[in-house]
Amino acid sequence: MLELYQTENCPYCVRVRGALADLGLDYIVRNEPDSHRERTRLKALSGQTFVPTLHDPERGVIIADDDDKIIEYVTEHYGRRVA
């Protein structure tokens, strides 16, 4: 299942959540702390601490800190986006 590493108030994360909802995709939300220093789980996964970060464990894909690329990826691999 897709995992979205995010913070609640990040506008780029809100955009990705909207796209995932538009596509009707199930995903796991991994809420990260506001402080980059405290994002140890995200750092261990991707080597960086920026959100949004999408992890697709089934395909071995991690897309970090790029809402456009995340939306493009899920649209291409999981269906078309409803605008």
Identify the residue ranges that each predicted region occupies.
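GST-like domain detector, emphasizing the conserved glutathione-binding G-site
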Residues: 1-9, 14-83
